[in-house]
Amino acid sequence: MPVCDLIPGTSCGDPRFTGADGNTFYFHGKKDESFCLVSDEQLHINARFMGNHNAESGRDFTWVQALGVTFGGHKLYVGARRAAEWDEDEDHVVVALDGEPVDLEPARNARWVSKAVRGLSVTRTADANAVTVELAGVFTISANAVPITDEDSRVHSYGKTERDSLVHLDVGYQFHGLTAGVDGVLGQTYRPNYVSKLDIAAKMPVMGGADKYRSSGLFATDCAVSRFHRSAAADGYTSFAS
């Protein structure tokens, strides 16, 4: 099943998000910058956006190129590798833990289990370009690397060229044990008292306020709405995952 059908909790395409409340919205961010998607006391997830600037609309067309997941003292990278020409048989998903590449056999159901972090695993859900990353009791992230098709680029003026097929990530998220104060572009929708301020009746509801979600880097936890506490997370994390 495509991850974009695993609602709620997705970020797909020019990124549209489906929150925990079931509402879908766009958050465009800015190309070559990182934004916090989920920020909680013991978990922080940033997305780095890639894209092209569209002169007619005056904004960037953006997609999620990589995720930076911080928990305890660990940094997990899940990214899409750039390709001039898309080959569905070639793997474009890159996963690394604390800077060390995760090596997965090129076969469906191939599985890697971390020796450093108890409960952390990566499983291929296809021979290439699709993985599920799970930290038991905390999160499951399903990531597919996908290109922009010639047809999509023509219809939406995305600006795909022969030098770049705009490979990006479509992502589905499942979380366990988030606190009531969780924040971030997607994370806020998991609050028990969350009330959407989006114009849901609009054809393309857009979440603004990019500045408060902007992070200084893929693994930075310094966005204005950050709830992550590194020391508390590192101290408490050993009880469930390391």
Regions found by a protein language model. Give the residues of each.
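Von Willebrand factor type D
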Residues: P2-S242
